[in-house]
Amino acid sequence: MFYYPNVLQRHTGCFATIWLAATRGSRLVKREYLRVNVVKTCEEILNYVLVRVQPPQPGLPRPRFSLYLSAQLQIGVIRVYSQQCQYLVEDIQHILERLHRAQLQIRIDMETELPSLLLPNHLAMMETLEDAPDPFFGMMSVDPRLPSPFDIPQIRHLLEAAIPERVEEIPPEVPTEPREPERIPVTVLPPEAITILEAEPIRMLEIEGERELPEVSRRELDLLIAEEEEAILLEIPRLPPPAPAEVEGIGEALGPEELRLTGWEPGALLMEVTPPEELRLPAPPSPERRPPVPPPPRRRRRRRLLFWDKETQISPEKFQEQLQTRAHCWECPMVQPPERTIRGPAELFRTPTLSGWLPPELLGLWTHCAQPPPKALRRELPEEAAAEEERRKIEVPSEIEVPREALEPSVPLMVSLEISLEAAEEEKSRISLIPPEERWAWPEVEAPEAPALPVVPELPEVPMEMPLVLPPELELLSLEAVHRAVALELQANREPDFSSLVSPLSPRRMAARVFYLLLVLSAQQILHVKQEKPYGRLLIQPGPRFH
């Protein structure tokens, strides 16, 4: 199983909440559930399963999930989505309840239209109508006469006064037309307004996949009733019926006369009434026939949660240990600056380009030619020693050749510098093959005496233009020297290239050193190196920071 810190780390990983919801590693709050974007998470899981995610660093393999991890993440997505749906249903129910409560508010203030329907306030009318304190002034044929507001009736006097008998007057019969049915007064409300309506129940949202319980069949009801009857029978034990042998023994003991049934006599009184067999109480059971006492019911164990995996989540200690070992990670390559990456000439000339750029045929020819056999080198050692002695003889000029070479320089100075550098390299290679004991005695014993050079007469200096030459010593080759040489070429209105800095006959170490310095200057944007075609002319141009 693969663990990725950037995927499963809590609060930082993209699948941390999904992983915790699937494994039940810790309790999640509502905010963490609602923070998950289910659609985007499903797309990311699908990209990881189908190996579409790019590696975190170039050169590393693409991350892929195991079957266990992908299954756990799918279960976690289902649980998170289910919890989000549950939160949505709860929020909707809460909103509906609050709306229902807002509709059930009872108004206790009187409406503005109701006071006009009531009887007029006489005291208020007296205060408003100062000119007519008696509101009933000028009104005639008022029956019954309303009391005056100035006379306060005595209730006790009214209660004690005798009520006069009223003679009923029979009005004459007058033919009347059939009247229309009386209309219901406005004060009577319709039954719909009086009837108390039940609150409409809140409908629950149907959840997909939820099934109702099946109806109980007749057979299942019979089985349940039979189980209840069996439980009742176990609680009240019945006596077994007497054996036929016991019944015969009882009959013989009583005799034939007692067994004979007596008829009913009217004069005889029934002193005792024996209950029938069905109503007789059962005799207490004997200790031999007592049923065994059932053992006390065993206490049910608490239901435990089922875990399919013994270890649902890796422990923090083991997780940290795996991170420290870095067994599943690649080490980050140490990138050195161009000033420190010094390659030897053998590596530079044996690897012309990347291996993927050249076809295999050309690459094989190049590697074959770039690696000379060691035997050929050993054979050339004595030949090179003889050539070196000849070069030393040639290098010692005579008194006549010195002014001639000074006036007519036929051989460029770079050739002589290259010859001296190659001689120095061969001297170093020969000295390195000698053991240290002999090397210490080498300058004392075999050091030849320096030959006496002839005195050269002084000649007047002839102003002449010297060719562009870099210092022959590798230690003196620096960025400033290469920069100065390129600047001189540009001042002379010439197009500098690599061959103008290093001649074709110069040693490989010098060419590699100058090429390395050019790369450093191009990285610093001081120079701009361009090559139009492979193995072609290497042009040098001033960069943005050239000054």
From Swiss-Prot:
Tissue: Expressed in testis and thymus. Expressed in the B-cell lines WI-L2-NS and Namalwa (at protein level).
Pfam families in the cross-refs: Rad21_Rec8, Rad21_Rec8_N
Region of interest (Disordered), residue spans: 278-301
Localization: Nucleus; Chromosome; Chromosome, Centromere
Sites of Phosphoserine modification: 148
Major subcellular site: nucleus
Any GO MF annotation of the entry: chromatin binding
Any Gene Ontology CC annotation: meiotic cohesin complex
Coiled-coil stretches noted in the UniProt entry, renumbered to this chain: none
Record's compositionally biased regions (Pro residues): 282-296
Gene3D superfamilies attached to this UniProt entry: Structural maintenance of chromosome 1. Chain E
Record bears the keyword RNA-binding: no
UniProt keyword annotations, A-Z: Centromere, Chromosome, Chromosome partition, Meiosis, Nucleus, Phosphoprotein
Entry annotated with the keyword Membrane: no
Description of post-translational modifications: Phosphorylated.
UniProt record, GO biological process: double-strand break repair; double-strand break repair via homologous recombination; fertilization; male meiosis I; meiotic cell cycle; meiotic sister chromatid cohesion; oocyte maturation; reciprocal meiotic recombination
Family: Belongs to the rad21 family.
Assembly and binders: Interacts (phosphorylated and unphosphorylated form) with SMC3. Interacts with SYCP3. Interacts (phosphorylated and unphosphorylated form) with SMC1B. Does not interact with SMC1A. Interacts with RAD51. Forms a complex with EWSR1, PRDM9, SYCP3 and SYCP1; complex formation is dependent of phosphorylated form of REC8 and requires PRDM9 bound to hotspot DNA; EWSR1 joins PRDM9 with the chromosomal axis through REC8.
Function comment: Required during meiosis for separation of sister chromatids and homologous chromosomes. Proteolytic cleavage of REC8 on chromosome arms by separin during anaphase I allows for homologous chromosome separation in meiosis I and cleavage of REC8 on centromeres during anaphase II allows for sister chromatid separation in meiosis II.
PANTHER family: MEIOTIC RECOMBINATION PROTEIN REC8 HOMOLOG, SCC1 / RAD21 FAMILY MEMBER
Protein known as: Meiotic recombination protein REC8 homolog
Organism: Homo sapiens
